[in-house]
């Protein structure tokens, strides 16, 4: 049976350290503050905002919310971002995405309007460049791949000299995860939809990060004994039993019943990477406040 790499243990340890750092900042007269920018009243956006606010309050981070109507123009949003950039009391900014359909074509321009020093969720090109150059002074890494690194660190999984395979090449998870693993001196291979013999490639990995976003795509054919599997994806499985006694629940990429007995360690879904991601966001806010 594989060791479960539980996100709660990582989150609890990380939160405890962040609370200490938040208190130290307050003793110096600095109140770490997160600005949350939301356009519209999408229920999933509201849920995400609620979760982020709750975690911030637990750690001792102040939250300021900036809400624009669903039909807000690009100019309205850019003006708001400029105002937040000029507000020295706000150290980090979370812009709830995706933006409404009429703003999607301008999303890159809108994201890059944000001051990279306040970009705690890696929305700007400069922050992304920092990930690829290994320069944290340029910005913060995306929270999800950073959460993967927190899990590896917490459980003492050394990446140096290890073969790591990342499934997925998105700019949000796959590519930055690959760069961050290289930063830990792993030898990294990235698999994607055009990769030939993906299962064979994955079986050679010591550390396998699955960020395909495809339910049941990671089967026992992709893994071998001794591997560490980080299942990043959050998918909906309509056939998975839920806590209410019915069907329909969150699941990762892995066919868990197949993969778990075959590997050394694995992150469950839910209860793995996702639970760490929000605390990583708060870590970035604290770090941004410490840099002021």
Feature locations, PLM:
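Positively charged, low-complexity intrinsically disordered leader regions
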Residues: 1-30
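Short, well-structured alpha-helical segments in soluble
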Residues: 76-88
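Short, high-confidence coil segments that cap the C-terminus of an alpha-helix
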Residues: 89-90, 205
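Short beta-strand elements in bilobed, periplasmic/extracellular small-molecule ligand-binding domains
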Residues: 56-70, 188-190
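Glycine-rich phosphate/diphosphate-binding loop of Rossmann-like nucleotide-binding domains
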Residues: 39-53, 136-232, 237-240, 247-260
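Rossmann-fold NAD(P)-binding glycine/threonine-rich loop
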Residues: 108-119, 124-132, 233-292
């Amino acid at each position: 049976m594989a060791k479960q790499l539980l996100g709660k243990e990582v989150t609890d340890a990380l939160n405890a350290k962040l609370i200490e750092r938040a208190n130290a900042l307050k003793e110096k007269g600095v109140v770490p503050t997160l600005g949350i920018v939301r356009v519209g009243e999408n229920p999933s956006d509201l849920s995400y905002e609620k979760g982020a606010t709750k975690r911030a309050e637990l750690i001792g981070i102040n939250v300021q919310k900036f809400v624009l109507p669903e039909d807000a123009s690009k100019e309205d949003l850019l003006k708001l971002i400029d105002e937040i950039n000029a507000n020295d009391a706000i150290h980090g900014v979370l812009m709830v995405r995706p933006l409404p359909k009429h703003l999607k074509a301008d999303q890159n321009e809108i994201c890059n309007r944000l001051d990279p020093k306040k970009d705690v969720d890696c929305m700007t090109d400069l922050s992304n460049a920092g990930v690829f150059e290994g320069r944290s002074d340029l910005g913060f890494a995306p929270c999800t791949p950073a959460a993967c690194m927190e899990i590896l660190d917490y459980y003492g999984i050394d990446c140096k000299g290890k073969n790591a395979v990342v499934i997925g090449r998105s700019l949000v998870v796959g590519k930055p995860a690959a760069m961050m693993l290289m930063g830990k001196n792993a030898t990294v291979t990235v698999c994607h939809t055009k990769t030939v013999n993906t299962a064979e490639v994955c079986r050679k990995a010591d550390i396998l990060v699955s960020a395909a976003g495809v339910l049941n795509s990671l089967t026992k054919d992709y893994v071998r004994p001794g591997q560490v599997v980080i299942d990043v994806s959050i998918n909906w499985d309509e056939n998975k039993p839920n806590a209410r006694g019915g069907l329909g629940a969150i699941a990762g990429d892995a066919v868990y019943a197949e993969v778990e007995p075959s590997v050394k360690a694995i992150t469950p879904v839910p209860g793995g990477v996702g639970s760490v991601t929000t605390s990583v966001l708060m870590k970035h806010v604290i770090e941004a406040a410490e840099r002021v």
